[in-house]
Design a protein with these regions (language model features):
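C-terminal structural segment of proteins
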Residues: 1-276
Length: 276
């Protein structure tokens, strides 16, 4: 990582440079040259922190959410399964929602679609951990466990500029815009507001028993007779599943067909759990 300036602004109005909070995702990306920043702005002390009723400060760590009695069960479990204890104590919920893809072609700086190239190398190459929905022109899979839980819990994002429903935070990449979020330059997530469910659960399939990114993650949140589903690891962005039958319309690549069956099983188990 080349030398760069680290600023500690006294207020949000003074933030200039790339925002840095927990740094568990950003710092490795900077070290690997996958993102560029001449200056970093340490915003950790400026972000709201903690859980108050239905509002969560973006600076709240995953470890704090995991222990919070006010957070929905699905979110607590998603935070518990998201990373090692060290990373959970550093990583913030706001940063976790903005995680970069784990796609190895992108991480190895192949000239892939997300890097401005004309094709997705994973589609014709190794893609066992990639997407089963919306996987053309990019087959990357979003790695955030908490994002799936917040999607099921109908979360709303409050930034320093606007308010938007969680699905509006994300976008699928196009030829004109390869980014995966709708945040503008310098825009900061400040708080997350959710609708507390009657019951919720998060289930996850991963290669290792602990501290691995999701092959498939399924969150279910029940509101009366209605159950909302959010999935991780199945699309370039956190994926809202309108019904279990939507899995019939998945478009897996040859190496990801197994994910459809895992998703079916986890959705069935999640629905049974919140309806019990």
């Amino acid at each position: 990582m080349s030398e760069r300036t680290l600023r500690r602004p006294a207020s949000l109005a003074e933030v200039a440079g790339r925002p840095l909070a927990g740094g568990t995702d950003l710092v490795p990306l900077l070290q690997d040259g996958l993102v560029e920043a001449d200056a970093l702005a340490d915003v950790r002390e400026l972000l709201p922190r903690g859980v108050e009723g239905s509002r969560i400060g973006a600076g709240t760590t995953l470890a704090e959410l995991e222990r919070s009695e006010e957070a929905p069960g699905a979110l607590r479990e998603a935070c518990r399964l998201a990373a090692s204890p060290q990373l959970r104590h550093m990583g913030t919920i706001g940063g976790n929602l903005l995680q970069a893809t784990r796609c190895w072609y992108w991480r190895l700086a192949f000239p892939c679609f997300l890097h401005g190239g004309d094709r997705c190398h994973a589609r014709e190459g190794e893609h066992r951990e990639h997407a089963i929905f919306a996987n053309d022109p990019c087959a990357s899979a979003h790695p955030s466990d908490p994002a799936a839980a917040l999607l099921a819990c109908s979360a709303t994002i409050l930034t320093d500029r606007r308010r938007l429903a969680l699905p509006e935070l994300y976008r699928l990449p196009t030829d004109d815009d390869r980014s995966l979020t709708t945040l503008e330059d310098g825009e900061l997530i400040l708080e997350i507001e959710l609708a507390p469910p009657d019951d919720s659960v998060y289930l996850k399939a991963m290669d290792r028993r602990r501290f691995s990114f999701p092959l498939v993650g399924v969150a279910a949140a029940r509101y009366g007779d209605d159950v909302r589903l959010g999935l991780s690891g199945v699309a370039p962005i956190p994926w809202q599943l309108d019904s279990p039958e939507e899995l019939d319309r998945a478009t897996p690549l040859p190496g990801t067909a197994y994910k459809v069956e895992i998703a079916r099983a986890l959705v069935r188990r999640a629905l049974e759990a919140v309806r019990a």
